[in-house]
């Protein structure tokens, strides 16, 4: 039987991932900093993990690759995406500190189902697959933590599916996305609810199955209606009620 080939859009990315494996060295200072995650309290974890810092744009693993283990995101953010053979990309979510990246594939032995790329400098704890399986077999607390993390991930997938397929327009999709970001990581300021985001309009479009031009246009409409204001690294939601009305919340 012919082996599954990764999408063409990821061939170059796979080479980048291999280069990272070959060239990135262990960072001793990273290993000394505590990392909060669903398995952080597990016994003997410090003896199993390999801690590294990765710069922005680093590919941790690629859709279709055989699983080597779990990447625990300790600091920073990363985008989790899938791609078609034609090169169309869909960003499934933005991973946050504490997320277990690649856990599904590590547990099942099936290829990674998505590609993960860092959005900023990240600190990552890597645990090899065989060590993860042994750890979960011996530590009930770690096993429960992973089960809860996977349950939260499933809930997030359901919510993102709702955003993509039950929204009637690009305006509604983008409004839903911004409302969700307000809840997940928004901070109240004098200018409104601040959402830190260094995603490009192209990347935001890849989260809602729209074009870059559409996202730019819709954000412009929101700005003209004084629903949001924009800066280089943040979106300020000035009128949440109006945004929720557009999102049909």
Residue ranges, per PLM feature:
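Phosphate-/nucleic-acid-contacting segments
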Residues: 177, 181-249
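Cyclic nucleotide-binding regulatory module and flanking cytosolic helices
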Residues: 2-59, 100, 105-107
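Cyclic nucleotide-binding regulatory domains
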Residues: 42, 53, 58-121
């Amino acid at each position: 039987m012919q082996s599954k080939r990764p999408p063409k859009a990821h061939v170059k990315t796979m080479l980048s991932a291999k280069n990272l494996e070959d060239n990135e060295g262990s960072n001793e200072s990273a290993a000394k900093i505590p990392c909060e995650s669903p398995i952080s309290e597990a016994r003997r974890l410090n003896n199993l993990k390999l801690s590294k810092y990765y710069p922005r744009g680093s590919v941790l693993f690629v859709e279709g690759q055989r699983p080597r283990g779990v990447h625990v995101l300790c600091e920073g953010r990363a985008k989790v995406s899938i791609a078609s053979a034609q090169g169309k990309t869909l960003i499934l979510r933005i991973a946050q500190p504490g997320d277990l990246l690649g856990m599904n594939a590590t547990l099942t032995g099936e290829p990674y189902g998505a590609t993960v790329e860092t959005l900023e400098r990240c600190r990552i704890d890597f645990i090899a697959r065989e060590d993860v399986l042994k750890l979960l077999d011996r530590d009930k607390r770690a096993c429960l933590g992973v089960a809860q993390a996977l349950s939260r991930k499933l809930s997030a997938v359901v919510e993102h599916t709702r955003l993509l397929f039950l929204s009637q327009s690009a305006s509604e999709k983008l409004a839903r996305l911004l409302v969700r970001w307000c809840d997940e990581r928004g901070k109240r300021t004098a200018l409104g609810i601040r959402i830190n985001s260094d995603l490009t309009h192209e990347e935001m479009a890849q989260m809602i199955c729209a074009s870059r031009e559409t996202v730019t246009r819709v954000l412009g409409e929101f700005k003209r209606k004084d629903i949001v204001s924009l800066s280089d690294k943040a979106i300020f939601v000035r009128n949440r009620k109006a945004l929720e009305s557009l999102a049909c919340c």
